[in-house]
A protein has these predicted regions:
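Acidic/polar alpha-helix N-cap and adjacent early helical turns
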Residues: 161-177
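Conserved ATP/PPi-binding loop(s) of AMP-dependent carboxylate-activating enzymes
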Residues: 2-36, 70-72
């Protein structure tokens, strides 16, 4: 890959050194190291501040949404949506699209006794906070809870399954969101 040296740009954190392991035991190590021997962490980091720079982890590379060639960090949208009035929690995930590769779905949990937002309201909220139009979700799923791992982190892969199941129901005429 390329070395990123300017603040505001994000890339995958890779490193090498005498104490870096040689690979995983008993499994394929394809893609674990770069061509020049750097270990690929899978963490997406952004360079921040003026020199000396510091690095901030902004997400996982596997979670990046590729919508028509545009790379979108779901973490940015998650953070903004968590401030939406009447929501307990929110996260976005991708779902397959023939034309664009992937589209974005906002998955939200609404506070008890609060009205559920609609997609137009969610998009308007995001636009007012400076989100580019290509990053806006095309779908909204209202959930009882977001799937989480034992550490409490949202499991996007499970969100994607929920969204795909909902899309299947829509296509079969059994569900509307």
């Amino acid at each position: 890959g390329e070395t990123i040296e300017q603040a505001g740009r994000a890339g995958e954190l890779c490193f090498a050194g005498a104490t870096v392991f040689d690979g995983y035991l008993g499994t394929s190590n394809d893609g674990v190291f770069t061509a020049d021997g750097y270990f690929r962490t899978g963490d997406l980091v952004e360079i921040c501040g003026n020199p000396p720079h510091y690095y901030q982890i902004v997400g996982r590379c596997k979670d990046i949404i590729n919508r028509g060639g545009m790379k979108i960090s779901p973490t940015e949208l998650d953070t903004l949506l968590e401030g939406y009035p009447g929501l307990v929690e929110a996260a976005v995930c991708s779902y397959p699209d023939e034309a664009l590769g992937e589209k974005i779905c906002a998955c939200v949990v609404v506070e008890p006794n609060q009205p559920a937002p609609d997609l137009t309201a969610i998009c308007s909220y995001l636009l007012k906070r400076g989100v580019a139009k290509f990053k806006l979700p095309e779908r909204l799923e209202i959930l009882d809870a977001l799937p989480r791992n034992p550490m409490g982190k949202v499991v996007r892969a499970e969100l994607q399954v929920i969204v795909r199941d909902a899309l299947q129901k829509v296509r079969s005429g059994a569900h509307r969101t």
